[in-house]
Amino acid sequence: MEKFLVTPVRCYYELELPQAPRRRKRWPLLLAMHGYEGNKDSMMRVARRVADGRMVVISLQGPNQFFRHSGDGEPKNFPVGFGWGTTYKMEDSIKIHHRNVCALISLATRKYHADPSGVFLMAFSQACAYNYRFVFTYQHQVRGVVAVCGGVPGDWHENPHYSAARTHILHIAAARDEWYTREKNLQFRRQLARRAASLDFRFYNSTHRFPRSSIPHIRKWIERHL
């Protein structure tokens, strides 16, 4: 007989506060999430460049840790990667993600002078679908979503909680993505266009990596939607 218990788990994040002269009472918030096998530090390096000292930046680390096998040697020396969940009881992983996003938005608003009307989520790979689940469930909480090399939720048509959101979306696809074909990405574009407040969908000549050449456009896109 399967049962369960609930225990508190620490979820870690990196924080960077704005460096630009303060011309407003509150700052926009960029909440960034890494891909599968990534971590908060790797995503913060990208998010910092996007924010350019003009946003409160939080890089949240996935709650699930595992060893990344890197050849021979002692397992204790293997690098550690993090993820957001698997297909095993995925609803639990989704609830944790939603709860953490809400908690960080609240924290940034209360403690770090973030503007609750200027919240942007940015994700790479696996975390993209989690963010899409969030914004199409909580349709009025997020100003914009930046999704890089990711897909839409697998329950896009079946989940009764999803509906059109006031959220603007910038989706960056890789033309040479090993996981998502061009046809699959075009399908994502059609799906997102039906539910986003606006959609900017772009292909970059890249494999399944965060194309650094996209950072200037991401920055301008965020500025345009503030």
Show which residues each predicted segment covers:
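Hydrophobic/aromatic beta-strand patches that form the interior of the parallel beta-sheet core
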Residues: 31, 58-60, 120, 146, ...
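The feature captures the conserved acid-bearing segment of alpha/beta-hydrolase catalytic domains
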Residues: 150-226
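Serine-hydrolase catalytic machinery in alpha/beta-hydrolase-like enzymes
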Residues: 4-114, 118
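Conserved alpha/beta-hydrolase "nucleophile elbow" surrounding the catalytic nucleophile
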Residues: 34-36, 122-124, 174
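Primarily recognizes the serine-hydrolase "nucleophile elbow" in alpha/beta-hydrolase
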Residues: 117-164
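A generic structural signal for alpha->beta connector loops
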Residues: 54-57, 118, 141-142, 166, ...
